[in-house]
Amino acid sequence: MSTSEVARLKQQIELEYIAAERGLNGFAAGAAKHEFITARMENIGRCHEQLKTLVGENEAIKALAQALEQAGSEAAQ
């Protein structure tokens, strides 16, 4: 397991979540907003899949939850 790769993926999940949150509350409307947010969520899914191959399913779920919690805290500030 590459600790730096796991950290990179968690950081990417945080960034994608924050981008989706901003897209939800931003000025875009309609289909463009939906497509933007969908793309961010799909990217999070890809990161989660990569985490599963690195650390296994249970640890990947924990890492995803930690990243989303951290991103939620940052987005709220």
Task: Please identify what each model-predicted range represents.
Residues 36-66:
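Short, charge-rich amphipathic interface segments used for partner binding and complex assembly
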Residues 27-37:
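Short, surface-exposed loop/turn segments at secondary-structure junctions
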Residues 2, 73-75:
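A charge-rich, low-complexity, intrinsically flexible signal that marks solvent-exposed coils, linkers
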Residues 1-29:
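N-terminal acidic leader/helix
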Residues 66-72:
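Short A/G/S/P-biased low-complexity tracts
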